[in-house]
Amino acid sequence: MSIQVLSEKIRALNSDWPDRWVSLRDVFKSCHERLGIAVPFDQRTSRLLAGGLSVSNFVEHSCKNMARKNKEPGYHSRLHTAIVLESLTALLLEQRQIDKLNTQSLIREEILLLVAMAGHDAGHDGSRNSSICQLESRSFRLIRPLLEAAKCDERDIYAIKRIIWSTDPTLYEKLHNGARTTDFDLIKPSWQAVLCQEADILASAIPEFEKQLTLSLADERSKVYPISAEGLLSPGGRKYFLTHYAKFSSPAAR
C-alpha cells in the first residue's frame, strides 16, 4: 500500500480541519469515485450508495451541531471518520492490485465497507464502552433508519451492523485470529471486519500522525477518564497500542 499517497490525503484533511472543512459527504463521494464507483451497476448497489451518502450527510450535520455547542469529540470527530474513509479506500485499492481485480469485481462489497465506516462512530460523544459494543450499537441504531429510507437490502443492513460492531477494540484480537484461519476474500464477513478495523486505526500506526492523534484521543478522554488519558501519554501507552490494537492481517495492510 502506498503510505505516501495516504499520508498526503491525511495531511490535506488535517490542513482543512476545521476552518476550510468540506463535508463528510464530499469525502465519501470522493472515495467511492476514486474506486471507480461513479455509476453503480444494479439497483441493490445503487441503494447502498444512496444510503452511504445519506449516512455521511447525517454524521456531518449531527457532528456540526455538537461542534456549535463545543461538544464534538476531539478524536472521534468528522475528521477521524474522513481519515478512516481515506484509509479504507487506500486498503481497497491496494487489495485490488494484489488480487489483480478490475474495478467492477467487488463493487457492492467495497461500497458496503465504505457505508459502514461512514457511520461507525455516528453519535459518538467521547465516552467509552461500559459493555461490549455499547457505542457501536448506538451508532448503528442512529443510521439504520437512513439505510431503510434508502431501501437498502436487509442483507446489506445486517452486514453494516456486523461491521460496525466489529470496530469495538476489545474484539480485534479474536476477529483477526479467526480471519487468519482462512484465505483473504472480501466476500467473507471476517475479512470485511478485519479490513475495516485496520482502516479505523491505520493512521495512528503511521509515525507522522501518531503523536497528534494520541494527543487528540488523550484530550478527549481527559474530560471523563483522566487516568486513561494519562496512560495514553505514558511511555508504555504507545507500546500497549502497538501490541494490543495495531493489528494488520489483510494482504493490503502487510
Model regions and ranges:
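Histidine- and acidic-residue-rich, metal-dependent catalytic cores
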Residues: 81, 88, 136-178, 236-237, ...
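His-Asp-centered metal-binding catalytic motifs of divalent-metal-dependent phosphohydrolases/nucleases
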Residues: 84, 110-127, 139, 162-170
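Short helix-to-loop capping/linker segments positioned immediately adjacent to catalytic or ligand/cofactor-binding
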Residues: 101, 127-130, 147-154
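Short alpha-helical hairpin
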Residues: 37-67
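Divalent metal-dependent phosphate-bond-processing catalytic cores, especially two-metal-ion Mg2+/Mn2+ enzymes
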Residues: 1-41, 75, 87-107, 119, ...
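Active-site flanking loop/helix segments enriched in acidic
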Residues: 56-87, 123-127
